[in-house]
Amino acid sequence: MPQTTKTESAVVSLAAIRTPRRGVTEYLFFERQQIFTVRASAARRAESANLLRRALREQQPLTVVLDPRRGEIQRIDTPTAKELELFNRGKIAPDVRGTARKIDLARLDPSTFNVVDLSLKVPIFRLCKKTIPNYKTAKKIFDFCAKQSCHLGGPFDITPCIPFQYVIDGCYARAHKMRQIITTKYRYCCEKVFSFANSGSDTLAVKADKWGGCCVFWWYHVAPLVRVRIKLGRFRITLAMVIDPGMFDKPVLLSTWLAAQANKTCSQNANVSMYSIQPGSAYWPTSFSGTTFGTDPNYSLTNGTLISYQNLITCP
């Protein structure tokens, strides 16, 4: 049965605390793409703010109860020893880390931006050479992934299903499951592309047209990035394309994916501050600057999140 509201308990670490001008203080967690606030009595709000500020200052994780539908932090606790043990995770080694770049969407030229080795000179691309041979194959991969969406009811070709119908959070898990499909079922290269709203009051804002048309807001987003060879007359070029069935009905150019996250009808602060292309093993960010990343090599975090979100929906 689809659910519109579900509180969840999680161990998280703070990426940043920011207070927009004349706005409500926002709390950003590495383990959640969604932006959260504290809405309570003045006394409770002050107590929570102190706990959160101390956790950020001391770089200590917290156990929180979150209400994703309202984007609110309902309770804050100290993690148990067992929770801390499970929370510890690996990070991408510096020698295989990818490229992070600031971006001005208004000045982006799609005719050149998406061309690999022209505008997109990314050293980690050299680590894998088996790129997708044509758009038809990329669409086949996209369609296979999209068919695993939990809202379709099954039967599914994979376990667990992927909750594309719930885009409020969980992009890191959806992206990692698709990366597993692309690299093991189809055996093609798959990197990850992260978008960030980590400058000033920037916010990633998307109109969820596939799931009811409501607006959703993130501080980061991630999806599989694939390199697709395209024939143009006598020439062949390789384009960077993104597989993101939560947002689109087909593979799209990297520039299209980025632009869709700056929907001004959803927020006047809608803007992509920067993007980062990382190895497919990157799971979620571990720095607010978007330069270090955690991993999930055995897909345990991935599958747990997919199962937790499988019955949730985006728009009420």
Predicted regions and their residues:
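Structural detector for short beta-strands of small beta-barrel domains
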Residues: 2-30, 88
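A short macromolecule-binding patch
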Residues: 32-43
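Short nucleic-acid-contacting surface segments enriched for D/E, G, S/T with interspersed K/R
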Residues: 45-65
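OB-fold/S1-family single-stranded nucleic acid-binding modules
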Residues: 65-100
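Secondary-structure boundary elements
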Residues: 91-170, 174
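Cysteine-centered nucleophilic/redox motifs
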Residues: 141, 157-201, 224
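His-Asp-centered catalytic microenvironments across diverse enzyme cores
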Residues: 204-316
